[in-house]
Swiss-Prot record:
The lineage of its organism: Eukaryota, Viridiplantae, Streptophyta, Embryophyta, Tracheophyta. InterPro entries: Ribosomal_uS2, Ribosomal_uS2_bac/mit/plastid, Ribosomal_uS2_CS, Ribosomal_uS2_flav_dom_sf. SUPFAM superfamilies: Ribosomal protein S2. One of its GO terms (biological process) is translation. GO terms for cellular component: chloroplast; mitochondrial small ribosomal subunit. GO terms for molecular function: structural constituent of ribosome. This is Small ribosomal subunit protein uS2c.
Amino acid sequence: MTRRYWNIHLEEMMEAGVHFGHGTRKWNPRMAPYISAKRKGIHITNLTRTARFLSEACDLVFDAASRGKNFLLVGTKNKAADSVASAAIRARCHYVNKKWLGGMLTNWSTTETRLHKFRDLRAEQKTGKLNRLPKRDAAMLKRQLSHLQTYLGGIKYMTGLPDIVIIVDQQEEYTALRECLTLGIPTICLIDTNCDPDLADISIPANDDAIASIRLILNKLVSAICEGRSSSIRNR
């Protein structure tokens, strides 16, 4: 795997509050190697370790993007949702930022059926076909379309399982992480001091509750993805 420089600075991470963990009572002992101190009842994450694993993750996604791999970003809690969507759109990645529907990956055939239905309804709306239906039928299909847009809008162009999944908040997205583990899909996961660092392929110790922290980590990762895609185009 190519090792590159990703412009990761400890000062920048401190300003974003990446180092603030959970209260010392809410912690996973497996996170001990990634914690540098306790301050006012809060665990402080070792940002040197954060920088190391973030750099490794950037190397991984750069190489994967340069080989045309597909990415899925997952972060459904309110503090992560907007950052996940904007980061994914910027890097042309798929994303889930509202609710993880159980079996979204492990029961891919069902998800694929829903996506086909979603695409058909979108096409019918664009052509005006929905408006030519009886009012009751049109209203029902529009509600269905709205529901599908909310939960599948970020993966509407997915045609198969993703090659790498990036997860914000291991605890919140545990179902998504388990599905990736079941299917053997590589994962990169933001982990706070209450998480298990051994579950993901690359775990990045970071504050997963602060918007600035989430945004900073995602920005570094999607910048690496964008660079990887650009290098692929240049090398053709």
